[in-house]
């Protein structure tokens, strides 16, 4: 490595990034954060409160925001987007836009939320987004509207990369970052 990078790592914010992991995405981000810090990079993690940060890493706090009575009615319909996620990612992207002149060398997005993708062209800092799932409406829409804007996308498998082929011309496959010595393959679920 020639020089340490200042990396803003955007995690999903629904569950803390800590053991026991809520799922594979949380495990991936936890292992990646530690590996980057071990290689000498400076990582700032955007994640849910209660996340287990790697030594020498910082955290961008997910602020809890209360809703007004007028905003209490669900829109979009329940299950489509969680409002607290929307507000948290909007707040984060505004903060990153303010810091983008000098704050970070790269932003690495692992969220499943559309706002980091949709607002990435407004940042001066390059953003890499890792795709962990097949396309779904909100994320596909955001990627479709920003396609061709010089953003880089990676996927955790060839299957995931192929699933995004209708929207993206190029998705680089970087195999899932979970430490297979600590998480060996098992018999599988039901």
Which positions does each model-derived feature cover?
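Catalytic cores of nucleotide-sugar-dependent glycosyltransferases that transfer UDP/GDP/TDP-activated
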Residues: 1-190
